[in-house]
Amino acid sequence: MMKNVLVIGSTGQIGSELTMKIRREIPGSTVVAGYIPGAEPKGILLETRPAELADVRNAPQLAAIVEKYQIDTIYNLAALLSAVAEKKPLLAWDIQMNGLLNILEVAREKKCAVFTPSSIGSFGPETPHVGTPQDTIQRPRSMYGVTKVATELLSDYYFHKYGVDTRSVRFPGLISNVTLPGGGTTDYAVEVYYSAVKGEEFVCPIAPGTYMDMMYMPDALHAAVQLMEADPTRLVHRNSFNIASMSFEPEQLFAKIREYIPGLKVRYEVDPVRQAIANSWPDSMDDSCARAEWDWKPTYDLDSMTVDMIECLRKKLL
């Protein structure tokens, strides 16, 4: 059972919601919101404290936080997303690999569990695209994907070599009604809801017919907590589990939104960088191992997610 938790990247797309979820749902827990300069916590994230500067590239800083709060679990959410990582590959490597190594070393010394998410971006064009198996060829062609595969391998290494309790999932594209997109290939599936609710034309950077696995943020947060609370004796895999919820292409998403907002207008301006990344990713993943080993099961499908997204964004924007 998690008690003292450090969330690194607490103000990002996943971290901002995950930090508050753990604070609400695990009685007596201390959840430290780790952040970097320029991405300070605000609002309820700050009000519910504690918060600490936590740069993954600063190992002594991380060790001091773990010692100060007697951290038992680290959520490492520091990363550049796929499209941004292609523009800044060296920075992506520094944050995602050198940063991870710092975290794993601190975890080894201080006996912490570590969750570092992987992604559908860890797969490449040689991967079976439909029903992508848990264990299969990966070979990504983006810097983001390369770092994710290396993350999986390094995390497994620290488990087998040093006994560090490392666990992770391969997140699909994540759709949130709370945080804005941050430079990912699947961001279009968030942005279109904002355009629809505001009555604006949406310019889609991904070509019609491009299927990708997606997931509503509440399911992703549940997975991140559920896996870290799971019985370790059941875990055959650790880094990283396929988890799936829904798979769709742009026209299917737009048609679903038009069931509730008929006036949605869309035109395509395909971004070749994002499209190339999307083409190399799976259309759908087989998550049977997660279901068997820790009882993973999503709650939302495309329709229920769309209803909730529109309702929440109307309250937020109008």
Set out the residue ranges of the language-model regions.
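Conserved Rossmann-fold NAD(P)-dependent oxidoreductase catalytic core, especially the SDR/UDP-sugar
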Residues: N76, L101-M143
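SDR active-site strand-loop-helix element
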Residues: I8, G34, I74-L80, V114-I120, ...
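NAD(P)-dependent short-chain dehydrogenase/reductase
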Residues: D156-Y211, M217-H222
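NAD(P)H-binding glycine-rich loop region in Rossmannoid oxidoreductase-like domains
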Residues: V56-I95
